Amino acid sequence: MKIFSLYIEKYMKFEKQEIKFNSENISKSKEDFQKELFGKMNITLFCGLNGTGKTSILSFMAKIFRYLQRFRERIPSDFKIHYSIKKENKEYDIKLLKKDSKIIISINDDFQNQIMEYDAKKGKYIEDKSSDLKQVTYDDIKFYLPNNILVLGFDIAYEGISYSYNYYGDRLIEYSNLQKTYMKTAAATYTSLGILKFLYLINYNKIFKKILNIKFSPFVDIYFRYLAKSGEYEEYYYEEFWEKYTILEESSIRKINLEKIFNNRELFKKLMFLIENEIIYINEYYIEKNFKKIKINQMSTGEKAFLYHLFFIMANIKENTIIIWEEPETHLNKLWSKQLIPLLTLLCKDLNVHFLISSHETVLINSLFSNQILLLKDSTIDFPNFETFLTNENEIISNISEKIEYNLFEEYIIKKLNISKQEELKVLLNNIGDSFLKFLIYQKLK
């Protein structure tokens, strides 16, 4: 899954705006270097000051796929999106556009397909008899769409993006409301698979464990949903089977030791099957701090949100997934923010996916190459004109942020510099960090 470009006719502050996701000036050697680090995954980070339109672009992208089958009037502008997907060992070049209320798809440059809109009340697709284009159903072209779109966003911009419980149609969007994740105190069916995959990976991958620097307990609490039974693996539904792996039992919850299960590949596959089919779900997991086991509701807001986001992604990510993630650094300390891109790379480099991220965080920016970053300013969207990968923070701030003409504290020091005596200047010198102002004070004391 690789997005090449997005054209927006008129939406929010954008009018006749084309956004290119790939620089045409990247050298072959740089491309090869990036592939060593990022593998098959693609990533684009949108950065810029508040109000430059980062969220507008990402939420618009989500709305394209949310309303492609039904409610097309809710796609707020005509558009054209160009991407490629790989399925069944073939690569397909796709152009999807909306023009004059028509949705048209081009597959390998065949522009003869108009996607009919589905009318749920009539239970059928509605043919556009005024059109000369070949009419196809959403089901006909679903193969050429992303397998799913994961959205980790905020309520206002993504209002209505999730599906109602009785929605009839394809559910292409998986939505995680960022505000609500800060309040979650327990796991559930929709993250259980992600928790299991995550704990399995951290159990065996030393690099992953080193990057994350969190000690996870091998124990989880599981809950049995008897009403969800089906024929396959029936012998593994019963709590009697899991008794030999149980550490503690409280009511309908059992604490089990995952290390024993991870060492038995067949048993691990069966547990994964039961979780995928919502027969068992993980109700609680633990990290270890100061030799104590900490439950979800005892974790900090940042720990809880960060882990939940990773579990959500791991539970839902597939080949040809688009992941839209708004400000992933929210509530993270600098160390975790710095490790986020390497962590995603370790998790996803073998998958053909595309991450779309909005962020102001310098340690995310310098984890990426300049052709993976789009800098939004008042009237332009372009790649940074300097190399961002592993550059220092000051270089990023001076090149990406607008220059601040006035700073109250700096003005105060400059005034003191001009009127203070030697002893006062020495006090200033000892209380200011390394900077150009400190250099000026030092010069004054000479």
Model-based region annotation:
Residues 1-71, 82, 86, 278-413:
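Switch/communication elements of ASCE P-loop NTPase nucleotide-binding domains
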Residues 1-250, 378, 410-446:
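P-loop NTPase switch/coupling surface
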Residues 228-299:
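Long, low-complexity, polar/charged, intrinsically disordered or flexibly structured peripheral segments
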Residues 143, 189, 252-255, 261-269, ...:
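Low-complexity, intrinsically disordered regions enriched in charged/polar residues
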